[in-house]
């Protein structure tokens, strides 16, 4: 029945609110949690922020496995700080999503049931220390490229969370580069091959 597929007609009041909302975004204003927003905007934000939060939490796992096996005490301390940062990023983002009226339990239920996703890069195993370095240098480097524009997104709580996340991701990228650089410049031929393989 084609009538079932039709969207409901919006009232003049809803159209006026949506025009004012779009004008605020066009002017570069932040939309805050208590501001009126169209339902499709809210749903899109919940989906995007939750996927991002899930990726930060799941992203702790491949590197967390290496905390006890890092090659030096210095590397262990750096990796532990990085894993803690990633957990914090997930928490900042869950808090930003909660400002949209969704609970953390709902977000996690969606992840556990498969209705919500996370970045598939974290499904690849970290078989050796070079894999950990590549995650820091290249995966976190790619994340920075994707996430810096989010510091200027229209939703204020998300944008503010991203400012801190991006600063910390820069540290993560530097530690990944440094770990690989040490392996390439001071490592054995087997370690250099390991970096190339990673």
List each model region and its residues:
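Acidic/His metal-coordination segments adjacent to aromatic residues that form catalytic metal sites
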Residues: 29-50, 110-136, 153, 186-191
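A contiguous pocket-lining binding segment that forms or flanks enzyme active sites
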Residues: 157-198
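Extreme N-terminal leader/anchor segments
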Residues: 1-37, 75
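Helix-loop segments that flank and shape redox-cofactor active sites
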Residues: 36-41, 59-81, 143-158
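Alpha-helical scaffold segments that form or flank carboxylate-/histidine-based iron centers
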Residues: 41-52, 71-89, 132, 157-169
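Amphipathic, well-ordered alpha-helical segments in soluble domains
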Residues: 55-63, 89, 139-146, 172-176
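N-terminal hydrophobic targeting segments
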Residues: 56-125
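Conserved alpha-helical segments that form or flank metal/cofactor-binding pockets of metalloenzymes
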Residues: 2-19, 82-110, 176-183
């Amino acid at each position: 029945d084609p009538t079932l597929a039709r969207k409901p007609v919006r009232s003049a009041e809803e159209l006026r609110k949506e025009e004012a909302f779009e004008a605020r975004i066009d002017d570069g204003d932040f939309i805050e949690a208590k501001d009126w927003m169209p339902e499709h905007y809210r749903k899109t934000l919940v989906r995007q922020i939750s996927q991002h939060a899930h990726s930060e939490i799941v992203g702790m796992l491949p590197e967390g496995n290496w905390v006890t096996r890092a090659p030096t005490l210095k590397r262990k301390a750096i990796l532990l700080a990085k894993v803690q940062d990633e957990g914090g990023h997930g928490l900042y983002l869950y808090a930003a999503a909660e400002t949209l009226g969704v609970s953390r339990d709902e977000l996690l239920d969606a992840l556990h049931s498969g209705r919500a996703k996370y970045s598939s890069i974290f499904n690849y195993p970290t078989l050796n220390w070079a894999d950990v370095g590549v995650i820091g240098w290249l995966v976190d480097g790619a994340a920075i490229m994707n996430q810096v524009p989010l510091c200027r997104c229209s939703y204020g709580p998300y944008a503010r969370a991203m400012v801190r996340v991006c600063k910390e991701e820069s540290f993560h990228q530097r530690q990944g580069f440094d770990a690989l650089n040490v392996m390439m410049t001071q490592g054995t031929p087997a370690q250099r091959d390991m970096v190339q393989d990673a």
